[in-house]
Amino acid sequence: MHPVGHVDIAGVRYELPDGRVLLDDVSFRVGEGAKVALVGANGAGKTTLLRIITGDLVPHAGAITRSGGLGVMRQMVTHGIEGATIHDLLLSVAPQRVRDAAAHVDACELAMMENDDEKTQMRYAVALSEWADAGGYDIEVTWDVCTMAALGISYDRSKYRELTTLSGGEQKRLVLEFLLRGPDEVLLLDEPDNFLDVPGKTWLEERINESA
């Protein structure tokens, strides 16, 4: 039986720091296989609601329940990873278990640069095993498909390329390529067509229509 994903928002209320009510008694459910667009004027609270669903913000009332893995594309995909590489961008939208395993591998590699004794080597071997168990090698295969589709370059050749060398559309296309191919059952995409050109918007529409 394949995992299912859903999001249930019940009676959510959110107040701004000055006391103004931004969201009040917001309720809806997104069931398995549904594709839903959240439409509203600038400042209506769309991004705030998405941040409540992800757990970044806590509502003043109401509840959020969800099931399945959650993949998130924020409005600014490079926020928090400025000066980073294509590898860092793809890793930032990977499942938490993969991110944790990658951090452990990086820490062990740094430790080996300082002290290459048997104990450190054993820790590195364990970290690589955890990376494999987390699906790290499999996800690198997916990343290769994504970089080829978005940039026409293999992951091995592009992973250390700085994000500043990519356009905003290329950055978004990379993230979308991964999330739409990735393992998560629930995707939250905040203004996904921003920076995409007309062919990119057409591609996104087709991919969303094709997705389960």
Identify the function of each model-found stretch.
Residues 1-212:
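ABC ATP-binding cassette signature C-motif
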